[in-house]
Amino acid sequence: SFRGGHRVLAFGDMLAVPGTEMSLAEARDRGASVDFFYNPEDALKKAEEEKETIFVLAAVGFETTAPVWATVVKEADERHISNLKLLTALKTMPETLGELCTAGNIDGFLCPGHVAVITGAERYRALSETYGKPMVIGGFTADLLLSAVARLVLAVNKGQGGFWNDYGSVVTEKGNVKAWERVGAFFEKGDALWRGLGVVKNSGVYLKEKYHLYDAGSRGLVEDHIPAGCRCGNILLGKNMPKDCPHFGRTCTPSHPVGACMVSSEGACCIILREEGVEEL
């Protein structure tokens, strides 16, 4: 973002994510060319209007956002927009859940309903059958979430495996086939690095060689430097609680996050700090 003729575009919640040296927000404060956008069409229009600038999109997410980025590449290709590139960190859940199943310290899984809308329930059903772990796809309203949690706790307490789709009003067995077909037209699977887990085979999504013009070097990404004492990796794996981290509520806060778990309002550390504070420290 400090390179002349380049501008980094990201969704607003990405700006505060700690980077190897600084966050995008901090880079912008120091004079880097960084901006946020609300939808991908904004980025496409900016690239069309400012042809002398290379726009690098921070394309981050899981199965839910991968179709969006596939559409961006499709539109850029059809509209002959050559000054727009994606720096991707797109990952898929089933492979990683499989990795977690082998870790041995997790008894059951509340599966992501929004991801299952795209992938379909069958991916999680297969995982449950393979590893003998109870898995429940839950919805996002209070009643659906509580129902899914209750079902999962009951299964764990009984020592049972099994799979349940408690979000059947939205999640089908096959998922959104057309959306995933679009992803497959522009992207391919590959190994990906996960914080706390290391490299997980075939859990990443990368642009195909045919569309390398739109790739800003995604396959060469390495894991960010993790500050000494940061417990984000273990928190994500369920091995530590946020309050086990020496940075929690002190040097790591929502306004100045040290680790990824404090960045989003949905992050474990941010939720615990908001709901429970730091009175026990």
Where are these regions (language model features)?
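Alpha-helical scaffold elements adjacent to nucleotide-binding pockets in ATP/GTP-utilizing enzyme cores
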Residues: 23-26, 68-72, 126, 148-152
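Internal helical hairpin/lid segments
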Residues: 146-234
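A conserved active-site cap/scaffold subdomain adjacent to cofactor or substrate pockets
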Residues: 104-171
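General beta-strand structural signal in soluble alpha/beta enzymes
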Residues: 9-12, 34-39, 56-59, 85-89, ...
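Metallocofactor- and cofactor-centric catalytic cores in central/energy metabolism, strongly enriched
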Residues: 1-52, 66, 76-79, 87, ...
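Phosphate/pyrophosphate-binding betaalpha-module
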Residues: 58, 62-123
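Conserved mixed alpha/beta catalytic, RNA-binding, or beta-rich assembly cores of soluble enzyme
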Residues: 34-40, 90-94, 111-112, 140, ...
